[in-house]
Design a protein with these regions (language model features):
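Non-transmembrane, aqueous-exposed alpha-helical and coiled segments at domain scale
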Residues: 1-456
Length: 456
C-alpha cells in the first residue's frame, strides 16, 4: 500500500456527508442553556466585559468604567504599556524623530524605560540576532500558502536549534524571547519569498540584515527588491508595530500563550500557539478583511463622497445583502473599547499625510466615512444603544498597502509586533502564576448504556 501523497488526502464527499449527518444527529448545545446555567460564553460577562481571569503588570486596556451599581460607562480608550500611555510614546517618537518600537520591547519585557546606553546596547543585541541559525533554510524550503502557518512551523523549528529549549529559568526564557523578537521578521520575509516562488511563480530574493537598522527599517529593507524606503514610510511602520505590541492578557492570542505557558511547556510551543490564535479572522486576520471590504465598497459605491450612498451600502452589508455575506462591517467594534480605540486614532492621524502623498486619498477618506457613518447604522439596524467605535484594523490594512506590502503578510506583521507582548506575558505567567489554567465545563450529554456491537 502506498501512503505517499503530494497533497493531504481528502475523504469521499458522500462519506463526509454521512459522517456530518451522524454528528448533527447526536450533538447540539442550546445557547439558552448557557444563559440559564450562568456560563460566561467567550469568557464574557452579560454586559460584554471580560471575566476576570488573572493579574498582570504588563498592559492595561481601558475602554470603560463601572459605576457603583456595576453598569458600564463608556470612556475614551487608553492603552497603557507598563504604566506608560502609548500616546506619550508616539509624541516622543515624532517630537524627536526617532524609532520607538525597540524601546517598547524593552519596556514590555522588563517593566522600565531604558536609558540611552541600555537602549543602544539592546538595539545592538537585536541586530546581532536577526539572522537565522545555520542550516535553518532547510526548514524554510518547505513553503506554505499561508505565511502565518509557516511562521508557526519556523518558530517550532527553532526548538531543534536550542540546547536549552526546555529550560524554564527566567534567564533562559528572556534569552529565547529576545531571540524570537529579533529573528521573526527575517522568518516572515523569507517565508513570503518562498511563497512567491513556489505558489505565485515569481522571482524571489533574499537580503541580509543591515547593521544599525530599526525593526521597521529591517523589514522594509529585506522585503523590498531594491531595499529602498523613505524615512516617513519606516516611521509609519514603526507606529504600526508600536500600537500592536500588546493588548492585555485577555485577548485571544495572549491568553493562548498564557494557557500554554501555565502547563510548563517550552517557549517555542507557547508562541507558535499564539500565532495560530492570531491567524483567525475574528482576531488578527481582521485587518485583511477590512481592506478587502474597502475595495468592495469603492467598487460598488459610485460617488464615495455621497454619505447617503455609502450609508445605504453599509446597511446592505449589515443585512448580508452585500460584501462577503458575513453581515460584518470589518474594522468597527471592539470587545473593550467603546468611544474610541487609541491605536486607531494614532494610525488614522499618522497615515493621512502619506495617503494623500501617495494617491490613496479616496481610500483614506472612505475609511473616515465608514468610521463616521457606521455607528448610526448599527444603532438603526440592531436597535442597540451600545456605542460602537472603529478599531485598530480599520486603517492598518490601508497603511500596509500604501507601503507596498502584500496582503500575504498583513497578519504576519501583526504577529511580529505582538511577539514582545506574548513573551512578556509568558514570563509573567511562568514566574508568578505557577498554576495550570484549568476552567470547568459542564457536561450536558445524555447517559447511554453500552451495547455490544451485535445489538446496535
Amino acid at each position: 500500500m502506498n501512503f505517499a501523497h503530494s497533497e493531504v488526502a481528502t475523504l469521499d464527499p458522500n462519506t463526509m456527508r454521512t459522517l456530518c449527518e451522524e454528528y448533527v444527529a447526536n450533538n447540539y448545545i442550546d445557547p439558552e442553556t448557557s444563559e440559564r446555567l450562568g456560563v460566561k460564553r467567550g469568557l464574557r460577562n452579560p454586559d460584554g466585559t471580560g471575566v476576570l481571569a488573572g493579574l498582570t503588570n504588563v498592559c492595561d486596556v481601558v475602554g470603560y468604567k463601572k459605576d457603583q451599581e456595576g453598569h458600564v460607562i463608556p470612556t475614551p480608550g487608553k492603552l497603557i504599556y507598563r504604566g506608560v500611555n502609548i500616546n506619550e510614546i508616539v509624541d516622543e517618537a515624532y517630537r524627536n524623530d526617532r524609532f520607538v518600537f525597540e524601546e517598547v520591547i524593552w519596556l514590555l519585557l522588563f517593566g522600565s524605560l531604558p536609558n540611552r546606553e541600555q537602549l543602544d546596547d539592546f538595539c545592538e543585541i537585536l541586530a546581532e540576532h536577526r539572522a537565522l541559525p545555520e542550516g535553518f533554510m532547510d526548514t524554510m524550503n518547505a513553503p506554505s500558502p499561508n505565511i502565518m502557518n509557516k511562521l508557526q512551523r519556523c518558530v517550532l523549528g527553532l526548538y531543534s536549534y536550542d540546547e536549552h529549549a526546555e529550560d524554564l529559568s527566567l534567564e533562559n526564557i528572556l534569552s529565547q524571547s529576545i531571540n524570537l523578537i529579533a529573528s521573526m521578521p527575517t522568518m516572515m520575509v523569507n517565508a513570503y519569498q518562498m511563497k512567491r516562488r513556489y505558489y505565485d511563480k515569481q522571482s524571489m530574493f533574499f537580503h541580509l540584515p543591515k547593521p544599525g537598522q530599526s525593526t521597521a527599517e529591517h523589514i522594509l529593507s529585506t522585503y523590498r527588491p531594491d531595499q529602498k524606503f523613505t524615512h516617513e514610510e519606516a516611521k509609519l511602520l514603526d507606529m504600526c508595530l508600536l500600537v500592536h505590541a500588546d493588548h492585555g492578557g485577555g485577548n485571544c492570542s495572549t491568553f493562548t500563550a498564557r494557557v500554554l505557558s501555565s502547563s510548563g511547556t517550552d517557549t517555542y510551543s507557547a508562541i507558535a500557539a499564539a500565532i495560530g490564535a492570531l491567524k483567525g479572522p475574528k482576531h488578527g486576520g481582521a485587518n485583511l478583511m477590512v481592506y478587502r471590504q474597502l475595495k468592495d465598497i469603492l467598487k460598488h459605491v459610485e460617488n464615495p463622497e455621497d454619505d447617503d450612498e455609502v450609508r445605504e451600502y453599509l446597511r446592505r452589508i449589515l443585512r448580508k445583502q452585500a460584501g462577503d455575506g458575513s453581515g460584518l462591517i470589518y474594522g468597527m467594534g471592539h470587545a473593550v473599547y467603546t468611544i474610541s480605540d487609541p491605536r486607531e486614532v494614532i494610525l488614522k492621524q499618522r497615515a493621512r499625510h502619506l495617503a494623500y502623498d501617495k494617491g490613496f486619498e479616496e481610500e483614506y477618506n472612505m475609511l473616515c466615512s465608514i468610521e463616521r457613518l457606521a455607528p448610526g447604522i448599527f444603532a438603526e439596524e440592531k436597535g442597540s444603544t451600545k456605542p460602537v467605535c472603529a478599531n485598530v484594523d480599520l486603517f492598518s490594512g490601508l497603511i500596509y498597502n500604501m507601503l507596498g506590502i502584500s496582503e500575504d503578510i498583513y497578519t504576519p506583521l501583526f504577529a511580529i509586533a505582538r511577539v514582545p507582548g506574548w513573551c512578556a506575558h509568558r514570563v509573567e505567567e511562568v514566574v508568578f502564576a505557577n498554576r495550570i489554567i484549568r476552567p470547568a465545563y459542564k457536561y450536558l450529554g445524555v447517559r447511554q448504556k453500552y451495547k455490544p456491537i451485535e445489538e446496535r
